[in-house]
């Protein structure tokens, strides 16, 4: 058994605790709920714990796990704003991941707001909006 001074043992424990907290704190606070599985096998989730409603506007974190890789991406996460009064959505930020568990970004997060689009009938977005705009 290796001998480490008391100060060094405490420092290693602090580093280990910090790594543990950083690794698991974000996912433990999230409550990902599956809301759609498309015919192509893609599975959609939203984070129920971080839904923010302000009048007719709803901000929600959204995830997609692709059945087959899309341009080297196996999963996707975005923050979207849904306007319940006009049934539209705006992507506020988005990240593609090379793995199916949203841990390895394929590129930097895109923080540019995308143009508003109207929600299409029979889409995953419609199912999400129907759920959140009640």
Positions of predicted regions on the chain:
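N-terminal secretory-pathway/extracellular module detecting exported/lumenal segments
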Residues: 28-78, 83-134
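Short, solvent-exposed linear motifs at loop/edge-of-secondary-structure regions
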Residues: 1-4, 20, 30
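Sec-dependent N-terminal signal peptides
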Residues: 16-24
